[in-house]
Amino acid sequence: MILIIYAHPYPHHSHANKRMLEQARTLEGVEIRSLYQLYPDFNIDIAAEQEALSRADLIVWQHPMQWYSIPPLLKLWIDKVFSHGWAYGHGGTALHGKHLLWAVTTGGGESHFEIGAHPGFDVLSQPLQATAIYCGLNWLPPFAMHCTFICDDETLEGQARHYKQRLLEWQEAHHG
C-alpha cells in the first residue's frame, strides 16, 4: 500500500499538489492522509498515524517547499510519530524495510536549486534522507515539480501524470 502524507498548509490554494493527488487517487492501493485537514489544531493522533504507517509499503511525504524546508505540521508529525522505541532506538523497527519518497513542489525553477547562490536540491533533502535512513527506511530519489507558480495547466497536468507514473512503477516493481 502507498501512504501519502500530504502536508499543504493552504490546500485550497494548491494547483500542483492538487493535481498530483488527483492522479494518485486513480491508482489502487493508495491512501492519502491530509495533515492540515486532519490536524488543524496540530494535535496529532500518534496511534492513528503509526497504524496507517504500519500498513504502508511506500510512504510519500508530499508538500510544497517552504523556505527550503518542509511545512511546520509535517515537521511536528515526524517528531511525534517517528517516536523512540517505535521508529528508532531499542525495539524501534516498525519502519524497517519500507520505502520513502519525497514528493515536493517548488515555486522556483530547477536551476534555482543548483549549488551556488542557493543550496543544491540534494543538500535540501539531506535531513529528510538522514531521518529515513536512521529509521530503517529505503530512501528513493525525490520527485520534484518546479516552477509551479508560473506553469500553465497543461504543464502541471503532465507533471502530475509523471508523478502517478513514478508511483505506478514502484507498485509494479514491488507488487508485480
Curated annotation (Swiss-Prot):
Its cofactor is FMN. The keyword Signal does not apply. Regulatory subunit of a potassium efflux system that confers protection against electrophiles. Required for full activity of KefC. Shows redox enzymatic activity, but this enzymatic activity is not required for activation of KefC. Can use a wide range of substrates, including electrophilic quinones, and its function could be to reduce the redox toxicity of electrophilic quinones in parallel with acting as triggers for the KefC efflux system. It is an enzyme of class 1 (oxidoreductase). Pfam families: Flavodoxin_2. It is a peripheral membrane protein. FMN binds at residues 8, 14-17, 65-68, 105-108. This is Glutathione-regulated potassium-efflux system ancillary protein KefF. Its main location: membrane. One of its GO terms (cellular component) is potassium:proton antiporter complex. Keywords: Cell inner membrane, Cell membrane, Flavoprotein, FMN, Membrane, NAD, Oxidoreductase. It catalyses: a quinone + NADH + H(+) = a quinol + NAD(+); a quinone + NADPH + H(+) = a quinol + NADP(+). It is found in: Cell inner membrane. One of its GO terms (biological process) is regulation of intracellular pH. Belongs to the NAD(P)H dehydrogenase (quinone) family. KefF subfamily. GO terms for molecular function: electron transfer activity; FMN binding; NAD(P)H dehydrogenase (quinone) activity; NADH:ubiquinone reductase (non-electrogenic) activity; NADPH dehydrogenase (quinone) activity; protein homodimerization activity.
